[in-house]
């Protein structure tokens, strides 16, 4: 099967690189890769030997757990950056389950954010206001409007 071929290929690469443990395989994932892609590759290497959640829902629960740990770290002046990283890592794992590229997903989210922000700014100008003169509540109302009007699914 295709899966067996892939497993054999991975074993050959492991021998070629003289990697004896799965940890060494993970450590060989280039640090020069974008962090989201590297995280996904490392997670895949762990999954290859069975260290993985059985279902997507379990991976999602892990995100909630990590968010709670970040909240606790913020309250207690703990390891905030570390906990934030754990959330990102857990989110990347969900992307692996859903078979989406986390870099592409984030790039699309950034574009969507900018488009919605542009809507707010243009709407403010039409009302003769600068954004700096508007309250957050006014901008939030325009943001909600932008979500509806700029939604390509409608």
Predicted regions and their residues:
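Flexible "arm" and connector segments at domain edges
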Residues: 1-84, 88-154
